């Protein structure tokens, strides 16, 4: 496998890249991650089964688009490829540490707000379906935000759970609840990172960086809400964000709806206590 990866990387770089060092990196529940080195240039490699190729291809598409915005800093994609049994993505390697200092947290908040201001899009969705972790994320374009989120985010995850034999609520009834709660909220579509928890953000010598996106055009509050779901972001991050784009009234109610999507995805991926958390959140939303 590594010989094939080395050869494909050499073909891309137009010079022979001979791997002399390979270090397994911690983190990541889905793919194996490595740092490779030829003595001069290091790269970051994610590896999975061959069937994972499409997931790496759409991840690369999101990273390319985020780099195009010149707002938040993301790794550069070097190569997406496959071997006989595996698929892989190669990114430029940058040493990182936790993003936990006030100055850089404030800066990242500003950069995220600038991302949310970037571009013009009249509908919600994305040109391709992509993945939230290893879960397919449908992105069919829709003009109404309440319809898009209720059906392609909440309804989709609930249906996946139902196919696994888990029913937390009547799906059609709850989709209607979400539509009604979001009906009077008409945000402008913003390009989202889509999976913005603290494990996908770090600090490099060049400033804050984020990775593992699940991009789509949606309500910017979805990114902010997820930063609060699992915590780990400094107060200065939110101050930096709101110095560019203040949050709108009603955000704290909508936050529960938006984060339910990620809780349900964790139910589908991991089960366990996330099922109880999802049920409690559903009950809370119904009570609004």
UniProtKB/Swiss-Prot annotation:
InterPro entries linked to this entry: Fructo-/Ketosamine-3-kinase, Kinase-like_dom_sf
Catalytic site: 195
Keywords: ATP-binding, Kinase, Nucleotide-binding, Transferase
GO MF, any single term: kinase activity
Binding positions (ATP): 92-94
Enzyme class: transferase
EC number: 2.7.1.-
Pfam family, one: Fructosamin_kin
Family (UniProt): Belongs to the fructosamine kinase family.
Task performed by this protein: Ketoamine kinase that phosphorylates ketoamines on the third carbon of the sugar moiety to generate ketoamine 3-phosphate.
PANTHER family found in the cross-reference section: FRUCTOSAMINE 3 KINASE-RELATED PROTEIN (PTHR12149), PROTEIN-RIBULOSAMINE 3-KINASE (PTHR12149:SF8)
Name by which UniProt lists this protein: Probable ketoamine kinase VP1481
Organism per entry: Vibrio parahaemolyticus serotype O3:K6 (strain RIMD 2210633)
